[in-house]
Amino acid sequence: MSRKQKLILITGVVAVGLFALLFPKLRYYYAAFQKSTNTSSVTILIPSKVEALNIEVIATLLKEKGVLNDVAAFELVGENKEMNARNIAPGKYIIEPGTALRHIWNGFKMNSNHNGNAEQTVKVSFENCRSLNDLAGKLQQQLESDSAAFMAAFQDANELNRLGFTYEQVPALFIPNTYEMYWDQKPQAFIEQMAKEFKNFWTPERMDKLKHVGLTTPSEAVTLASIVYSEQSKNAQEWPIIAGLYLNRIKQGIKLQSDPTFKFCWGDQLKGVQRLLAVHRDVDCPYNTYKIQGLPPGPIYLPPVGVVDAVLNATKHNYIFMCAKPDYSGTHNFTASGAEHIQNASAFQRWLAAELKNR
């Protein structure tokens, strides 16, 4: 073999070696700079379960969502970045059109706060909740955890004790509003966030008002607000009047005798019942204010913030009776006279009987 031939051979071997050495890197860089194929923003939810936190499952998910055409390229980038269940952060992500594959993986990577670098928060709202079960159901629709997991957290006696609540009182912890949190936030973390919101809500000013109206704890105020709202959910102008009425009864040692409290005892059994009877009212139940003295052990509803403030700013008057007006206004007649209350109640019953008869 001539010297020239040897030189050509050596050059060829070196070239092949360099190509073999550089090809994986060239292949990676080509893949890393490829871009997503979606033409509009795509929301991706990566579950917390370990089996979902791997390259192949995520690649399949993105392909199904129309984000990828070249699954192999996406998997190659993930492998090169050593992505796995230990550093992939579950949660909600938004993939914008034309996002480089390397940037997608960088977004999924867990940071020091244990969130993904590009993880998005979600807005969580809950209103019109009659019970903790209702609340858990609403949360299940907006967050990763199911209602059973939330209920288990709500019933954790050690945690409730740490926060200073009984199970009956804990509905007062949850202030209806819209909050920002991560989709994969666990029930325990949700409760911790609500505890902070509760502390922020109960300012020194509100605590002073609480004492001024004769109540001792925020739970009592929310419990009374839940009764007020259950009596009147449409006309906010009546909230401070009704609150003042019940506070008068508490101060005078008169049972609250609120129909919504005994209805609460029956759960869904009275759903659709238009005329409440004595047999319904006579149920033995710690929430039935026809049977017990003072407030029930906890809220019968998660009342809006405005009703809680109406309790704290209750109207001063001498009313101790209220009765629905005999019309469709949804408002009430208030009085301090037992005789006048009987007249108001009779007028309402006559009107209701006539309306039911005409249907």
Regions found by a protein language model. Name each.
Residues M1-I10, L45-E51, V57, E64-L68, ...:
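Intrinsic structural disorder
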Residues M1-S40:
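N-terminal type II signal-anchor transmembrane helix
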Residues K4-I8, E51-V57, Q140, K271, ...:
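A broad, low-specificity signal for short, low-complexity segments enriched in glycine/proline
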Residues G17-F23, L68-D70, P97-T99, M151-N158, ...:
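Short linear motifs at secondary-structure transitions and domain/linker junctions
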Residues L26-F201:
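Signal peptide-directed extracytoplasmic domains
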Residues S125, E144-S145, E159-R359:
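Bacterial extracytoplasmic/cell-wall-associated proteins, especially those involved in peptidoglycan
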